[in-house]
């Protein structure tokens, strides 16, 4: 009720503190309206003029204020808003002199972000900053995750599901350049700092054939350009980050911008570690104590633009970033076998387990773009660039543990021994157990050293040609080369269950051991992965747009071709060309018309419908090795999407949009279940390219455009998504990494949520103070609740690989006896498919502003808090973890609601000039 009371109160604020005035912006000489002109209000808020050059803004009703107007190619203007009037005109004139040139009002160039029903939703300017700059991490993806059609993914997950698609299907593009893995912390946050971005557009419908390489969602990022006439400086410092942004003009024809930022979590980790020690028992917080290197991010970006003439512009963008984290964890068990507070001797374990892990990620890219207008009706753009990302991970787990055989195990392990796995095997004598009644557990000595490098080089050429009379044609070609390098040195112990008649002499334990009852064996596995694969994507597209003179009807139809040539060490796979036709149809039923006398209430009403095909490559395919089964049938992921929607624009800056969609996924790549081990260091992975998906749903958004006192939006998304892998049907489950299963092998994926709701508000009661609020709820993700039978021990024989015999042989102890360890198991007797708890994120930010008299310097002091409801909301437990070495359940819950059970608080200031 408190939230709704606040909403009601702030909606009443305009009537208490101000008034709305209309500003009309025109060309001084031609006296024509300037659509898209920006009005910067007295408090720094920006407003955009409509197609008639008009905009409504809120101003104080007790004094005169001054606003600024800006439009590309025109000199900035100032306008005094005096008392007693409600309508004002601001006339701007062209900057400089253009001889023998005609004035042309151009449409937005390709790549400019805009919200279009059935295609995309865009966020830019102040609303982007307000939603992305609330928490301890300022990230554009924080804003994207609040848009309709986006599934909740948690506080530290920048890879959401877009309209039921796999999170990995989302493709990011910066100024036309495809980015490989634009994330820090393994996908926890993105590299897109709001200070370097002017707008972000999420295309989750039937978007233009200009772009491909995705079957679910395209994120188009437009970089920020430096002001060509004024220097700008922004400095920020908070409890978790320090940043600087400098923009410098270049002779009035462009500018250069630098951004540097360091994110440090030392204070946050130190605080969490203190809380965990003061309130022990929370397993999630206890893990914080293992952090040896606090999570960090270091990034720098450089952008420049220069307009040589009115028809020729050069843009440059560069980025470099690094991030990492380190952990060191040590668990000790006392001589009595104390483990996690159990009764002394209950587990019979003494010793220690140590774990060390270090993760570092590096990435960078450089992009150059040239835009040329050879004639007023044609725009040409060439883009080229290179990029790379490298992930280095090192981990090691060691243990020095002595375990006592418990009595239940000794009762089972008796001579003569009858196999509990196969009663038909005659009784035999088992290997002798040590007289001490204990054994030295095998040192896991599990380690991984990984170096994963992705390099890409790409170029594209695009042309837009306005043919007149509402017709526009566009075409383009693109080349994208990618080199995937992966080196991994993995060592660990694996357990196998072998039965008589197992057809692989390397694992024929009956022949090796002569003890047929020992059907379980733990053996060392060592694997070196050395992959060097190449992929060349060649693409071409063409499209045509048409709009009737009265803008009642518009359409965009096009077709795209993508071809992949994939090769690696000893193999090459030329895939067939993929054709992707797409079409959109728009009907502006009410625009600039008085239909049924309601134009004063409903300003526009439009309807849209679209359908099209899309394709992408599963990233996991990039690390396929020679000999992997299924490689010869490599296919690209495909989807067919159909969208219908309607949008209504109301008086007062309100808009409502609702869209429904159906998406059919096919040729989806997946790893099949029959993974086999050919030798001690050889793994054969079988791939399938027959995965399917059926996704349908709808989303809606009610938005209040930027205004003086309150703005924001409410969005709701419903998604029903099921997947199916026919190749895995014979194994009796939906697929590896799947979620909630269905009887017919169609299953809900692990990332699926039926319901997602977001409320975003920006409240500005006075010029010097604002409140930013983000609240949402999301239904739970699929999970399985399993009922188990009795826990019982079983013997496991430890094995080593014999290089001479090329077989696994028994490991012997110091007395020459075969090493036998005890493990525990429990059989599932029932399964219930259910859902995890609902997520209820609530974030708040309080900002205080200080302005100088000239309005050029602004200081912001803010206090932000994320995950506030974690103080009062306790998610239900959804399961425990069974310890195979102790036979007990480790307590704890699997929460899908919060990343940490405490609010994340940040405090800082920002200074801008």
Tell where the protein language model's regions lie, with residue ranges.
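A short, solvent-exposed loop/turn motif at the edges and junctions
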Residues: 42, 64, 68-80, 110
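Transmembrane beta-barrel wall of Gram-negative outer-membrane proteins
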Residues: 240-264, 277-330, 358-382, 386, ...
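Short, acidic Ser/Thr/Gly-rich low-complexity loop/linker segments typical of extracellular
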Residues: 44-55
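Surface-exposed extracellular loop regions of Gram-negative outer-membrane beta-barrel proteins
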Residues: 587-642, 662-686, 774-788, 873-876
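C-terminal beta-signal and adjacent terminal beta-strands/loops
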Residues: 768, 776-805, 809-820, 841, ...
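Gram-negative outer-membrane beta-barrel transporters
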Residues: 547-553, 662-664, 685-788
């Amino acid at each position: 009720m408190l939230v709704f009371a606040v909403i009601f109160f702030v909606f009443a604020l305009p009537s208490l503190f101000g008034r709305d005035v209309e500003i009309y912006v025109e060309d001084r000489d031609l006296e024509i309206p300037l659509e898209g002109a920006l009005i910067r209000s007295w408090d720094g808020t920006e407003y955009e003029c409509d197609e008639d050059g008009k905009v409504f803004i809120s101003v104080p009703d007790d004094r005169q204020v001054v606003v600024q107007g800006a439009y590309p190619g025109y000199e900035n203007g100032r306008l005094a808003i005096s008392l007693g009037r409600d309508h004002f005109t601001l006339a701007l004139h062209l900057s400089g002199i253009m001889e023998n040139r005609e004035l042309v009002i151009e449409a937005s160039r390709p790549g400019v972000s805009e919200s279009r029903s059935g295609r995309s939703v865009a966020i830019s300017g102040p609303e982007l900053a307000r939603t992305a700059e609330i928490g301890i991490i300022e990230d554009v993806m924080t804003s994207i995750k609040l848009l309709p059609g986006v599934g909740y993914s948690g506080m530290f997950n920048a890879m959401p599901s877009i309209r039921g698609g796999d999170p990995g299907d989302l493709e990011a593009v910066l100024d036309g350049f495809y980015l490989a893995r634009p994330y820090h912390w393994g996908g926890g946050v993105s590299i897109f700092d709001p200070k370097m971005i002017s707008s972000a557009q999420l295309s989750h419908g039937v978007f233009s054939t200009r772009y491909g390489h995705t079957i679910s969602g395209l994120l188009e990022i437009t970089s920020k350009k430096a002001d060509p006439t004024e220097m700008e400086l922004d400095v920020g410092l908070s409890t978790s980050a320090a940043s600087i942004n400098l923009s410098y003009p270049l002779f009035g024809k462009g500018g250069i911008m630098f951004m540097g930022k360091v994110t440090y979590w030392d204070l946050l980790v130190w605080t969490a570690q203190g809380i965990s020690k003061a309130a022990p028992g929370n397993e999630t917080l206890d893990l914080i104590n293992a952090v040896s290197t606090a999570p960090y991010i270091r990034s720098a970006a450089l952008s420049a633009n220069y307009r040589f003439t009115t028809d020729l512009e050069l843009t440059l963008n560069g980025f470099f970033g690094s991030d990492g984290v380190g952990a060191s964890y040590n668990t000790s068990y006392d001589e009595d076998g104390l483990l996690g507070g159990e009764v002394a001797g209950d587990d019979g374990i003494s010793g220690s387990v140590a774990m060390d892990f270090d993760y570092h990620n590096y990435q960078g890219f450089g992009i150059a773009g040239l835009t040329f207008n050879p004639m007023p009706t044609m725009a040409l753009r060439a883009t080229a660039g290179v990029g790379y990302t490298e992930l280095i991970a090192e981990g090691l787990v060691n243990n020095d543990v002595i375990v006592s055989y418990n009595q239940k195990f000794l009762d089972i392990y008796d001579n003569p021994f009858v196999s509990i796995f196969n009663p038909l095997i005659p009784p035999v004598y088992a290997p002798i157990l040590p007289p001490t009644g204990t054994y030295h557990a095998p040192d896991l000595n599990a380690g991984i050293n990984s170096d994963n490098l992705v390099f890409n080089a790409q170029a594209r050429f695009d042309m837009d040609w306005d043919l007149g009379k509402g017709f526009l044609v566009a075409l383009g070609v693109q080349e994208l080369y990618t080199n995937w390098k992966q080196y991994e040195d993995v060592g660990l112990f694996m357990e196998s269950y072998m039965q008589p008649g197992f057809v692989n002499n390397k694992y024929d334990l009956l022949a090796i051991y002569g003890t047929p009852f020992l059907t379980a064996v733990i053996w060392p596995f060592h694997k070196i992965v050395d992959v060097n694969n190449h992929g060349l994507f060649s693409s071409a597209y063409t499209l045509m747009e048409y709009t009737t003179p009265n803008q009642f009807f518009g359409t965009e139809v096009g077709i795209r071709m993508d071809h992949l040539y994939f090769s690696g060490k000893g193999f090459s796979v030329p895939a067939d060309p993929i054709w992707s036709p797409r079409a959109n149809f728009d009907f502006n039923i009410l625009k600039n018309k008085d239909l049924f006398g309601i134009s004063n209430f409903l300003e526009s009403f439009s309807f849209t419908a679209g359908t099209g095909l899309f394709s992408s490559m599963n990233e996991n395919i990039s690390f396929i090795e020679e000999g992997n089964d299924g490689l010869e049938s490599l296919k690209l992921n495909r989807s067919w999407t159909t969208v219908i929607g309607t949008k209504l624009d109301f008086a007062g800056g309100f808009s409502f949009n609702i869209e429904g969609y159906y998406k059919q996924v096919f040729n989806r790549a997946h790893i099949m279940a029959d993974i086999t081990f050919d030798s001690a260091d050889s793994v054969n992975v079988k791939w399938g390219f027959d995965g399917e998906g059926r996704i349908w749903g709808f989303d809606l958004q009610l938005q209040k455009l930027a205004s003086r006192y309150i703005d924001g939006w409410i969005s709701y998304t419903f998604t029903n998504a099921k997947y199916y892998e026919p190749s895995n049907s014979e194994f009796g489950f939906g697929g590896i990494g799947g979620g909630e299963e269905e009887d017919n092998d169609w299953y809900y994926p692990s990332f699926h949520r039926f319901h997602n709701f977001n409320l975003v508000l920006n409240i500005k009661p006075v010029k010097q103070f604002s409140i930013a609020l983000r609240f949402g709820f999301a239904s739970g993700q699929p999970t399985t609740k399993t009922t188990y039978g009795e826990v019982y021990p079983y013997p496991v024989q430890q094995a080593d690989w014999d290089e001479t015999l090329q077989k696994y042989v028994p490991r012997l102890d110091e007395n020459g006896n075969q090493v036998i360890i005890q493990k525990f198991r429990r059989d599932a007797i029932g399964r219930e498919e259910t859902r995890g708890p609902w997520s209820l994120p609530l974030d708040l930010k309080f900002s205080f502003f200080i302005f100088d008299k000239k309005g050029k310097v602004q200081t912001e002091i803010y206090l932000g808090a994320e995950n506030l409801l974690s103080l009062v909301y306790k998610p239900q437990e959804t399961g425990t973890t069974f310890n195979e070495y102790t036979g007990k359940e480790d307590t704890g819950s699997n929460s899908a609601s919060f990343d940490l059970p405490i609010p994340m608080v940040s405090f800082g200031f920002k200074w801008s000039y």
